[in-house]
């Protein structure tokens, strides 16, 4: 029996320097049962992942497209590669013909390479999301992600060229044995080493570098958020009560902007009244903040609603003071999240904290310094304009800081995604590094190969396709809830 095929650069004849006696049926039966169970579990779990993403709307995100690509590659390993490996193990020789052998080799190389590249592009996606959250948010669409995934699979399918057409490039290549399933380049050391570097070592080193950057950025962001959260009172303490909106100490003879806005108008009859709009909540989409429609569809950012201000009235001060402010009835003002809300955990609290934070940082307007007396004619227009300008200024500050909070909310989501990526990369490296180290050793020393060790490293790499579907619900609450829903498991 020769060593069966494995991932992108595995060859049958690698262990020809150290042959062992074929195992008998009594020894093979338990092994076949275990390996068959692994194959069935791999197929079942990856089908569950694909069905979960298809059926659950919350999982229709750009990031999960890379998960789907990885699951498809793992599914091919479980459906085609593992069973044929077990069959080859039972037969001790290849008796299914050369065409089926080439099909098996092609599927093995393509699926294993696609799995590696899927983890790689997933890492790049997480890296860009963390390093440039708002800029990449506009660029990060399902179309672009799909193109990237197709490019990764296209590169993976390039393995078919040397597998099927090696003899067209190297006519003097010896004919393979009919009882072996091996590629025509099984003994070409330079080609195997080159492909191992391109397919595994280089992507792995880049992924480790990317993840180090991701970890550093997320850690700095968390430290920054702790400083911000420690600077302002929590939303639960404030309760959005009118009396709690009086922030900051009041200097003698001066009023804070919030107190000015809360002051009831005096009945002077001079200023025009802006009639309040209807009290029905209106859906708000800010072009620079929450108007990314594609992200709403992806489930990353939801909708929010604002109840309009009840009353806005131009209010003059005492006669001759020349100062006017907008008076807003705060008793009915509310900010209510929609049914869908922000899909990210803690998004609502984060947004509310930012609003309260901004309320403390509003700069004083012309309430601190008396303005020049306005002419009697057109005085009410001037006073009304002053109030509206202050409201406009307040809105601009809220919107500007909202941009920063969108970045913060996005980073919170990416922190959890980085955790998921960390587990995926750890499983990937632990499962595949033994095989590729062993491969590099025997590429230069065929007599150093041990068949049983080599067989173990092959299946350890295969088991990576079994572990990946277990990582998704472990690190993603939406996956966990969807899996429980599909399997009818009560929380």
Swiss-Prot record:
Disulfide bonds join 101-181, 445-448. Residues 108-113, 428-432 are annotated as: Important for agonist binding. The modification Phosphoserine is found at residues 231, 384, 400, 402. Residues 252-262 have a biased composition (Basic and acidic residues). SMART domains: 7TM_GPCR_Srsx. InterPro entries: GPCR_Rhodpsn, GPCR_Rhodpsn_7TM, Histamine_H1_rcpt. Residues 246-297, 360-385 are annotated as: Disordered. This is Histamine H1 receptor. It comes from Bos taurus (Bovine). The lineage of its organism: Eukaryota, Metazoa, Chordata, Craniata, Vertebrata.
